[in-house]
Structure formats: structure tokens, C-alpha cells
Amino acid sequence: GSICLEPKVVGPCKARIRRFYFDSETGKCTPFIYGGCGGNGNNFETLHACRAICRA
């Protein structure tokens, strides 16, 4: 899906939430720390969800 091509966005908030995003350069789902608000669709709660949607 096109959300998998969106850039990683931490967002403006200061929470430290472990999420996963699809890295289009490596073709892999990669963990990152999400701020808790803002962001975009390339933000998954689990590695499994990221892989399922982005076919990684």
C-alpha cells in the first residue's frame, strides 16, 4: 500500500511508544520510537501488522 512509502514520522508529542514502520530503502519493517500524536499511516503497533500490510 501507499502508506508503506510514507516517511517515518515521530510526531510532536513526547511519549515514547515503540512502533514499527516500513523502511522503503531496505524493504524491511523497522522499530522506531513514536511520540504518541501526529504521524502518518506508516506506523504499526506490531512487527506482524507492518509485515502483513507492507508485505515485508
Swiss-Prot record:
Its main location: secreted. Disulfide bonds join 4-54, 13-37, 29-50. Signal peptide: none annotated. It comes from the Eukaryota. Gene3D superfamilies: Pancreatic trypsin inhibitor Kunitz domain. It is found in: Secreted; Nematocyst. GO terms for molecular function: ion channel regulator activity; serine-type endopeptidase inhibitor activity; toxin activity. Residues 4-54 form the BPTI/Kunitz inhibitor domain. Keywords: Disulfide bond, Ion channel impairing toxin, Nematocyst, Protease inhibitor, Secreted, Serine protease inhibitor, Toxin. The keyword Nucleotidyltransferase does not apply. This recombinant serine protease inhibitor inhibits both trypsin (Ki=21 nM) and chymotrypsin (Ki=500 nM). It possesses anti-inflammatory activity in vitro. It inhibits macrophage LPS-induced nitric oxide synthesis, and blocks histamine influence on intracellular calcium concentration in murine bone marrow-derived macrophages, which can indicate inhibition of H1-histamine receptor (HRH1). In vitro, it shows cytoprotective activity in the oxidative stress agent 6-hydroxydopamine (6-OHDA)-induced neurotoxicity model. Belongs to the venom Kunitz-type family. Sea anemone type 2 potassium channel toxin subfamily. Negative results: has no activity on Kv1.1/KCNA1, Kv1.2/KCNA2, Kv1.3/KCNA3, Kv1.4/KCNA4, Kv1.5/KCNA5, Kv1.6/KCNA6, Shaker, Kv11.1/KCNH2/ERG1 potassium channels and on TRPV1, the capsaicin receptors. This is PI-stichotoxin-Hcr2o. It comes from Radianthus crispa (Leathery sea anemone).
